[in-house]
């Protein structure tokens, strides 16, 4: 049976749009901070609660790994927010497809995002000693998308005459 289009569901749609909005906001904060070091984002509540400090850290690009593995000029050494935008768009598109491969990719991509979230949360708390509201919210969104990806999609029942 081939792949067909369907609604991604309201919960997946809401989570993907929220994740996309937060990723775009993180890009905005990082760009504003690059232009003005004194920029204070809405998510900068105090010295230990500062998303702009986290986004501007070395772990805010390529998960802090790409530069050391592939070099600073690698095309993959992008802001983590770029990867977030791509991930949430992919999740939304895959959520609209009904098919075996779409389901497999949905599960695999959500598992990778949760693994990345655990890694970045560890960096956030134990290396940067910070609390990033935007980051924590995206981690929760990633867990929600992972849980959704494991739910069985109801099949359309054909009417018997």
Curated annotation (Swiss-Prot):
Swiss-Prot/TrEMBL catalytic activity: phylloquinone + [protein]-disulfide + H2O = 2,3-epoxyphylloquinone + [protein]-dithiol; phylloquinol + [protein]-disulfide = phylloquinone + [protein]-dithiol
Ranges facing Cytoplasmic side: 1-9, 96-100, 154-161
SS bonds (residue pairs): 43-51, 132-135
Biological process, per Gene Ontology: blood coagulation; bone development; peptidyl-glutamic acid carboxylation; positive regulation of coagulation; vitamin K biosynthetic process; vitamin K metabolic process; xenobiotic metabolic process
UniProt entry tagged with the keyword Transmembrane: yes
Lumenal side stretches: 30-80, 129-131
Modes of activity regulation: Inhibited by warfarin (coumadin). Warfarin locks VKORC1 in both redox states into the closed conformation.
Phenotype seen when the gene is deleted: Mice are born at the expected Mendelian rate and appear normal, but die between one and twenty days after birth, due to severe bleeding. In about 75% of the cases, subdural bleeding is observed, in addition to intracerebral and intramuscular bleeding. Daily oral administration of vitamin K to the mutant mice leads to normal survival, but the mice die within seven days after the cessation of vitamin K administration. Besides, both homozygous and heterozygous mutant mice display defects in bone development with reduced length of the calcified part of the long bones in front and hind limbs.
Membrane disposition: Multi-pass membrane protein
Broad class of enzyme this protein falls into: oxidoreductase
GO-annotated cellular components: endoplasmic reticulum; endoplasmic reticulum lumen; endoplasmic reticulum membrane
Gene3D superfamilies on file: VKOR domain
Subcellular location(s) of the protein: Endoplasmic reticulum membrane
Keywords on record: Disulfide bond, Endoplasmic reticulum, Membrane, Oxidoreductase, Quinone, Redox-active center, Transmembrane, Transmembrane helix
Domain of life assignment: Eukaryota
Chief localisation class: endoplasmic reticulum
Single GO MF annotation: vitamin-K-epoxide reductase (warfarin-sensitive) activity
Tissue and organ distribution: Detected in liver.
The family this protein is said to belong to: Belongs to the VKOR family.
Protein purpose: Involved in vitamin K metabolism. Catalytic subunit of the vitamin K epoxide reductase (VKOR) complex which reduces inactive vitamin K 2,3-epoxide to active vitamin K. Vitamin K is required for the gamma-carboxylation of various proteins, including clotting factors, and is required for normal blood coagulation, but also for normal bone development.
Domain remark from Swiss-Prot or TrEMBL: Partially oxidized VKORC1 forms a cysteine adduct with substrates, vitamin K 2,3-epoxide, inducing a closed conformation, juxtaposing all cysteines (S-S or SH) for unimpeded electron transfer. VKOR becomes fully oxidized with an open conformation that releases reaction products, vitamin K quinone, or hydroquinone. Cys-132 and Cys-135 constitute the catalytic redox-active center. Cys-43 and Cys-51 are the cysteine pair that mediates transfer of reducing equivalents during catalysis.
Protein name in the entry: Vitamin K epoxide reductase complex subunit 1
Gene: Vkorc1
